Amino acid sequence: MFICRKAFVALAAILLILTACAPPTPFDSITKTPRPGGTASASATETPAPATSSLRVEKEALRGAQVNIWHPWFGAEASLFQSQVTQFNTENEWGIVVNGQSQGNYSELFLQTDAALEDSSYPQIVVGLPEHALEWQEHVVDLQPYISDPLYGMSADEISDFPAVIWNQDEVDGKRFGVPAQRTARFVLYNQSWARELGFDSPPATSSEFEQQACAAHKALGEDEDSTNDPLGGWLIDTHAMTPLSWMIAFGGGVQEEEGYRFLTPGNIAAFRFVKTLQQKNCAWVASLDLPIPDRLAARQALFATASLEDLPDQARAFSVANNTDEWTVLEFPGDERAALVVYGSSYIMFESDDVTQLASWLFMRWLLSAENQVRWVQSTGLFPLRSSTMQLLGDYSSSHPQWAEAVELLSDGETTPRLASWRVVRVMLEDGFRDMFDTIRHPDLTAGQVPLILKQMDDTAEDLNN
């Protein structure tokens, strides 16, 4: 009835290959020294001593330094990144030359980088996921000395400008494996207008309230004149890996335990039983592929759906195309006593080379993280602003994208994904196992009572993948 452990591992490997998929002013340490001599009325001022770098690279040595960077982006994102590369090459004071190359998606980037590391033909920077950096850790440069450098680093105020959930994702056991490039999250989308018509004045704050509203939506469709929508309403089931992870955390669970994984926990059992029970009550359903999810939410086929931050523009367009003026918003995943939001995304990762090239690479990375550059990324991608100060430059964007602005307000509640190299394959297993739980054709007799067996199988498979 369940997929065997070996099949899980094999499927994870196949999916990884096939799946195609996010300048601060240098801080000068100033020491004022009283002027010797003088009178009591004299102004005791002194020219601040210039900051000096501890990185053992003369400024002149940076001129002409070549930095190659591989990234996963294509289309508009790739064009924007290339324009920023061109701008940096034109304007940077050191004469550094950056060359960008797209690998098409994260899966291909990982494979190409993995191969390049074997024959020492790798770039200086890659835009990869934090778990990728942990997989390559013997080649990855610890960025902490660059961040803390008196001349070329970042001040405490600059670092605190990054929300902790964004900044801390790349640090493991005191080593900084990267700095954030893009961050997103998975949200529950909620049709407020329809909910009010169903008698609910506020969004669900708990899982029980979520169930109550989802079942009310299903009941309403079953009682209208259109018999074709009788199976619909409620939550439109989604099996993106961050969806089950968010549900588990909302119920007090999670997946990482020290340097490994643990799926079979009371919180995870409660989370999986909750969503499976919703399906058994017909208050949650799996959509066919003939109509996109945004169109279904806009057509009131579901009261709740789940989507990532970058999907919000598509959802807004779907409501517009449908001439649907319903109000909708984004929510965290509700549990019994808390809600959950999982923040994830890509990072700039530096590989070992020589002192000059590494400093040149860092200076480009630091430049990309400026608030002004982040504005362009947000406007193009719809993802989170990496810095709090960026929001001050996005007033017009916030006004015209209200659901995005609401999502940003939830960022302080965010949590990170597991900081383990094996997460890149374990998340594929989690996604597949969660999807399989809702497959009533393969498993017509599967009930919420069998959830512990599913989670035990995930434990066993994750142990294999983590070793």
Q: Which positions does each model-derived feature cover?
A:
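Extracytoplasmic/periplasmic solute-binding protein
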Residues: V172-A181, R186, E211-Y261, A302
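Conserved C-terminal helix/tail region of periplasmic/extracytoplasmic solute-binding proteins
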Residues: G38, R196, S412-N467
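Extracytoplasmic "Venus flytrap"/periplasmic binding protein-like
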Residues: Q87, E91-D161, R196-G199, D295-R296, ...
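Short, solvent-exposed loop/beta-turn-alpha elements that line the ligand-binding surface or hinge
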Residues: V57, Q144-F162, D226-W235, G252-A271, ...
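Glycine-centered hinge/linker elements that transmit conformational signals in sensory
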Residues: Q213-H218, E258-S288, F333
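Long, aromatic- and glycine/proline-rich binding clefts that accommodate carbohydrate-like moieties
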Residues: W328-L331, Q379-D432, D436
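Extracytoplasmic/periplasmic substrate-recognition and gating elements
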Residues: R196-L198, I269, T277-A284, F319-L386, ...
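Hinge/lid segment of periplasmic solute-binding proteins
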Residues: A49-K59, L129-F187, S227, T325-E332
